[in-house]
Amino acid sequence: MSALQLTPQAASLAERLADLAVDALIAEADLSPKPALVDRRGSGAHTDLHLGLMHSSALSLWPTFKLMADAAGQFNTVGQPLREALGRLGRDGEATMLRTTQGVNTHRGAIWALGLLVTAAALDARNCAPEAVLARAASLAQIKDRQVLVQGSHGNEVVRRYGVMGAREQAQQGFPAVRDFALPQLQRSRAAGSGEQNARLDALLAIMTTLSDTCVLHRAGIEGLHTMQRGAQHVLDVGGSASLAGRRALNQLDQQLLALNASPGGAADLLAACLFIDGLEPALGRVSRSV
């Protein structure tokens, strides 16, 4: 059962946005076959993750996303107070996630990306076109959270070591992987009659073609990143996941990434962001504007 089915029809805007965020996370986890990622087939390149844990983690974040949307209604403008409220809520949400998963990092990157997007959507529910929401999210991400000292993380270490764009920079630029690659590919594959699951797989692959995925870089270095990018492009070049040649290439990419222990977790987070953005306008036409 999806989060959308758990919320009454008279749901507030904040509740509906939380539903959409959780549903995007669950849809990303369920999508199969994803190369070297947790899906319905198994745990991919991970030893500490499984599909049930991904579901539990996603559901545990519903209150966090709702509170973020509520904060947007409270402050009603992009600025330092809202940015720092989001930071506090995100840290609380991460603590909840870690309690739920017994210390396993399932969705830290997704809390950042989807938290910004939920808040950006709540700031102006009457203008939830992708470009508008992504621009508002970028404005929020560009504001420094003064309550946070610079912290070490695998992602930050990789950004410094390789000089690539990390999750923070991706958000500050308006999620170009979503705006310029995932959403257009999702629409192209749907228009080609590929089917929804294949269209979503193609959107994931489109992200993977150019993303400097810090999860892959951390686990497999430059070799892993190039294998991911070139392999994803090859799948799309031979017809995408709906074609026989594309499925063969996708299976080959899966095996290559597994051999390198490289899991494209950053791309998975951005696919969830893509699915959230894609669902906004259809869903918000059916909800109350009250928060």
Swiss-Prot record:
Disulfide bonds: none annotated. It comes from the Bacteria. Transmembrane segments: none annotated. Pfam families: CitG (PF01874). Its EC number is 2.4.2.52. The keyword Cell inner membrane does not apply. PANTHER family: 2-(5''-TRIPHOSPHORIBOSYL)-3'-DEPHOSPHOCOENZYME-A SYNTHASE (PTHR30201:SF2), TRIPHOSPHORIBOSYL-DEPHOSPHO-COA SYNTHASE (PTHR30201). NCBIfam families: malonate_mdcB (TIGR03132), PRK01237.1 (NF002315). Belongs to the CitG/MdcB family. Involved in the formation of 2-(5''-phosphoribosyl)-3'-dephosphocoenzyme-A, the prosthetic group of the acyl-carrier protein of the malonate decarboxylase. This is Probable 2-(5''-triphosphoribosyl)-3'-dephosphocoenzyme-A synthase. It comes from Pseudomonas savastanoi pv. phaseolicola (strain 1448A / Race 6) (Pseudomonas syringae pv. phaseolicola (strain 1448A / Race 6)). The lineage of its organism: Bacteria, Pseudomonadati, Pseudomonadota, Gammaproteobacteria, Pseudomonadales. The gene is mdcB.
